[in-house]
């Protein structure tokens, strides 16, 4: 563990804990706006210390960092990615997400609304369905699209990529904000081969609020000269896994925050 990593761990350990049931009751935020930042780990440690009075950290069985694995689904021609890249007002992403090595797993869909807010819907599924584009996933996505967009699925989904990372979750004491801090983020293709990762020493911080904006934590980030970035894990994953698609809108973020497989080996 580096000195920087140790500083971040110590800052996380100094925060007051919150249990999962209390966090979900206080700030479910399934309809929200997200603001994202790429933050050096040293700055993240300062951030956690600066937010100790206003935020608590999720703790489960004594742990404060948790492994996540999300598999994203799209059509063969990446229609969902293209809708995102073209900035369509109504666009969505489908995935399954597994928490750690245990059985907890969900089907999830994130739907962008016309006014910019994002709605996240999810339902529990068996862990063996993680990464599988079966009929249960198609039915869940179809129902969600009909409820919120008035139209069904209309395309065949297949697994396109997987993203793994270690996450720390904070919640504000007033329940207005939820903040996630992701590190050790790796992108894998459908065969499980690594295609890229978040640069070592960086964290992807997301501030989630009902109305958008940086929140109190964003103000602390601005005080360190850090500004929001426009990215999605799926968009970055496609750019790293399918470079033939092109990702001109993500070029700056990719260069500053991520490295491909060739660069990792160098």
Label each PLM-derived region with a short phrase:
Residues 1-266:
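Phosphate-end processing signature that detects enzymes handling 5′-triphosphorylated RNA
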